[in-house]
């Protein structure tokens, strides 16, 4: 893994945004909803997006738009992270990278307009420019179709059954029933834009103990209680946890820390990966940290409405150091999950 350098760290914050800002043609970084796919061809299929623990479809968690300056083949580049929110595992994680040159088959050569489009509706995209159909429930590749109407597409039998139960059974036989009005399947996470800001450097001598207490006090009672609860599980790892608290103190609402090749900040001294734990890319290159997802994101997900809640301390996403060329396909990368407490 690469050592920390002088590169600035970019922080991500969850903010509400109009639906049009979160569509693929705007190249968004976002949490929840359906994926705003970058390349419209070569999407990961149902098997690639199935939980390795329980086998059920993963939920889209977030995507980060991260183009690489000086790389014509990665003028557009995005990382997509998926997780399992089903009981009993609530743990499965998979991450994919996709990149495109500026001149491609899917987007204009010129930057997108910053003005809202003329239409006012918030229709759901169910077919990409490549012709690929998307699942009505999750927005991932939908190779399966309703055997009755042949108009509704799904990624899996599970999602077809869910949609059937929540209204497709009644609507299926009606003409023109698939007008992009999709019921709430209670599967997607709440949707937010990820707004990026550069982290201000915090000099150690500036954060005195009395100031530190004031900073932590400004973090909000709920978050302070959450972190104090985490602290109860710490023993010899106190220094690591205190470093974590100090690092996030000035921006306690950060949900993401981005910086290719930087060192992650861990929440615990346990389950920190060694270099041998991070598999090389199939191209032969090492993988380096691209970004880490912070526990603060859990406050936005409302995941406990399904029963047992998903949980993590840190999700560290590692990608190919060379960002190897992919054409229009999606390549799986690696994510390391550090828990606050041991998972039963």
Swiss-Prot record:
Residues that coordinate or bind Zn(2+) 2: 146, 149, 168, 172
Binding positions (Zn(2+) 1): 135, 138, 155, 159
GO annotation, cellular component aspect: cytoplasm; extracellular exosome; nucleus
Highest rank taxon of the organism: Eukaryota
Keyword Cytoplasm among UniProt keywords: no
UniProt keyword annotations, A-Z: Apoptosis, DNA-binding, Metal-binding, Nucleus, Ubl conjugation, Zinc, Zinc-finger
One Pfam family recorded for the sequence: PDCD2_C
Tissue: Ubiquitous.
ZnF region ranges: MYND-type: 135-172
Iron-sulfur among keywords: no
Chief location: nucleus
MF terms (GO), sorted A to Z: DNA binding; enzyme binding; zinc ion binding
Post-translational note: Ubiquitinated by PRKN, promoting proteasomal degradation.
Cellular compartment(s): Nucleus
GO process terms (BP): apoptotic process; positive regulation of apoptotic process; positive regulation of hematopoietic stem cell proliferation; regulation of hematopoietic progenitor cell differentiation
Its job: May be a DNA-binding protein with a regulatory function. May play an important role in cell death and/or in regulation of cell proliferation.
PANTHER family named in the record: PCDC2 PROGRAMMED CELL DEATH PROTEIN 2 -RELATED, PROGRAMMED CELL DEATH PROTEIN 2
Protein name (database record): Programmed cell death protein 2
Native species: Homo sapiens
């Amino acid at each position: 893994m690469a050592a920390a350098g002088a590169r600035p760290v970019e922080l991500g914050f969850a903010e509400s945004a109009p639906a049009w800002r979160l569509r693929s043609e705007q190249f968004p970084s976002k949490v929840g909803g359906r994926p705003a796919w970058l390349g419209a061809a070569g999407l990961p299929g149902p098997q690639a997006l199935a939980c390795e623990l329980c086998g059920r479809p993963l939920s889209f968690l977030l995507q980060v738009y991260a183009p690489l300056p000086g790389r014509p083949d990665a003028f557009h580049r995005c990382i997509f992270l998926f997780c399992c929110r089903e009981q009993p595992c609530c743990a499965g994680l998979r991450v994919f990278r996709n990149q495109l040159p500026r001149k491609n088959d899917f987007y204009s050569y010129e930057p997108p307009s910053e003005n809202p489009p003329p239409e006012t509706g918030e229709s759901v995209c169910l077919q990409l420019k490549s012709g690929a159909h998307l699942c009505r429930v999750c927005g991932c590749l939908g190779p399966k179709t309703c055997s009755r109407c042949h108009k509704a597409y799904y990624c899996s039998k599970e999602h077809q059954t869910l949609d059937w139960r929540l209204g497709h059974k009644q609507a299926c036989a009606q003409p023109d029933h698939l007008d992009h009005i999709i019921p709430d399947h209670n599967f997607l996470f709440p949707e937010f834009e990820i707004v990026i800001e550069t982290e201000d450097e915090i000099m150690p001598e500036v954060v005195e103990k009395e100031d530190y207490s004031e900073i932590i006090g400004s973090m909000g009672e709920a978050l302070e209680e959450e972190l104090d609860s985490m602290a109860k599980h710490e023993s010899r790892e106190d220094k690591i946890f205190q470093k974590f608290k100090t690092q996030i103190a000035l921006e306690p609402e950060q949900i993401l820390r981005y910086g290719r090749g930087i060192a992650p900040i861990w929440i615990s001294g346990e389950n920190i990966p060694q270099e041998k734990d991070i598999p090389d890319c199939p191209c032969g290159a090492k993988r380096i940290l691209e970004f880490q997802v912070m526990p603060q994101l859990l406050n936005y997900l409302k995941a406990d409405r399904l029963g047992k809640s998903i949980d993590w301390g840190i999700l560290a996403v590692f990608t190919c150091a060379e960002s190897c060329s992919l054409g229009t396909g999606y390549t799986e990368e690696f994510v390391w999950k550090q828990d606050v407490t041991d998972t039963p």
